[in-house]
A protein has these predicted regions:
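Long, continuous compositionally biased terminal/linker segments
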Residues: 43-57, 64, 107-117
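Long, charged/polar, surface-exposed segments that mediate recognition or autoinhibition
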Residues: 48-92
Length: 134
């Protein structure tokens, strides 16, 4: 059977090493996309839990049906998120005015919807680190 995704396998081994070398660990959260709860999904919040801080990194991955993907996308767009079509799927990005943090291209939290899956990171560049293919 295919391996189940876990917080230390959905992102690249190099990413896990960098984060754990910093003393960071992860907590698994419920992965909810535009009001759609993805029971098979995984949302991972990496942080240094030995200090009181909201500084961390979020990575998510899940399988998703076409119906759920359409519903999640329309819900996010209705909340003011923006859509960009890319070669690898549909990017849905939060309004940068409300972003906690952005990458050097100005993108904050971003979902990438592919064929039967969705990825999430707290910046669009962060999506590159999610290597899980399901």
């Amino acid at each position: 059977s295919a391996a189940e995704p876990t917080c230390d396998t959905i992102v690249s081994a190099g990413t896990v090493k960098v984060l754990t070398d910093q003393g960071w660990t992860f907590e698994e959260k419920e992965f909810v996309v535009g009001g759609v709860t993805l029971a098979d999904g995984l949302l991972c919040f990496w942080a240094d839990y030995s200090v009181a801080s909201d500084h961390g990194q979020l990575y998510g991955w899940s399988t998703i049906s076409a119906e759920d993907a359409a519903s999640a996308q329309s819900s996010l767009l209705a909340e003011g998120w923006t859509r960009e079509d890319g070669p690898d799927g549909i990017y849905i990005t939060e309004n940068p005015q409300f972003a906690m943090g952005t990458d050097e291209d100005g993108y904050g939290m971003t979902y990438l919807f592919g064929d039967g899956w969705v990825k999430f990171a707290d910046t669009r560049q962060g999506l590159i680190l999610i290597e899980w293919a399901g």
